[in-house]
């Protein structure tokens, strides 16, 4: 079983949007697709067959391209999760639910501090809620309640879920990363006081997970590169920093999209 893994990274994922659109143009399909945070949004657009939708959703609009960034981030997430699929950028739920591929959306359960891998095969609202949970950045967005769980961004616990993909039966993976090799994950230990103040009373395990996240990501990348050397994983990533996490420059974002598309096209012989 072949699989596709899409790392998160907010607007850095414009690179990923270009990669995935190139896949669609070349009729490349996967048996299993897993996405984290913004990568999860791109995953469902890929499986619904909506070329260009990821780019449109990530690109700043007139109502979200300026102003106080934190309030805009909160506004953007709600619009992206619950409004865009029905209004500005209609999502093809039918095509997504009819896809033969397994799709998993990664989120972090805040009480256990563990990753959960959501699937959804028929309920539109639950699909959107799971996507929202996967994208809910700690310290910025509220937790998302699903069933008895409370969830935040999946990148806290499993930024690049290749081990999960192997555990469900994949034997060959394409992994699309949103950052160049010299860049690492957010180091929450540098803002330990803020993390503890926000979550320490009710979510002590989450606090520990956040503080350890930088080291966990580094270890995960070491394993990733071992699989790459063994020929079980093919990695696609930007060669240089194209955009910031919350980039507002449309020109920079357009360049990142083009870079992703071109890198994927160049690597096509390795991918096919």
Please report, for each region that a protein language model flagged, where it lies by residue:
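Patatin-like phospholipase
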Residues: 1-36, 44-272
